[in-house]
Amino acid sequence: MKTHDVQSISIAKPRAEVFAYIANPANLPAWTNAFKSADAERAELVTPNGAVPIRLETRASAEQGTIDWIMTFPDGSVGAAYSRVTEDAGDSSIYSFVLMAPPVPLEALEGALESQKETLATELVSLRKRLEA
């Protein structure tokens, strides 16, 4: 059973600008469907059962272009998402995102990841539109 999905999108903006926007957790609610609110330490995650408060750790390295999020849920389970901004030709960037399966019971894993893959594809388009506007 697959436990991850990798997606990427080209963004017609310089790497530093794309990185700065994505690395700021306060911007997560603007381009994702998953976050109702977010800051440097916590977030409110939107789930099918309503909003859930979580601890959010953003690990960002401008030098490496990496932005990773570690999410700790009220029950102590931990989820993660890993991403990277890479320079492309000219003043463009490539944003790649490794979507990890959510910390859910095994019987729900495949459906949850499939649903999140579709959502991520939409979110990446939203991110590009927002940054290129």
Task: Give residue spans per PLM region.
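Short beta-strand segments that buttress and anchor functional surface loops
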Residues: A43-N49, I67-P74
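Short strand-connecting beta-turns/loops that link adjacent beta-strands
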Residues: P14, G50, E63-Q64, P74, ...
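Hydrophobic ligand-binding cavity/cleft-lining segments
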Residues: M1-A38
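Hydrophobic pocket/interface hotspot
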Residues: E17-I22, L28, T58, W69, ...
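Hydrophobic/aromatic beta-strand elements that line small-molecule binding cavities or substrate pockets
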Residues: Q7-I9, I54-A60, M71, G79-E87
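Intrinsic-disorder/low-complexity, polar/charged segments enriched in Ser/Thr/Lys/Arg/Asp/Glu/Gln
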Residues: K2-S8, P53, T66, V78-A80, ...
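Residue-level recognition of beta-strand termini and adjacent short loop/turns
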Residues: D39-R42, A89
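Beta-strand/loop substructures that line and gate deep hydrophobic ligand-binding cavities in soluble
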Residues: F73-A133
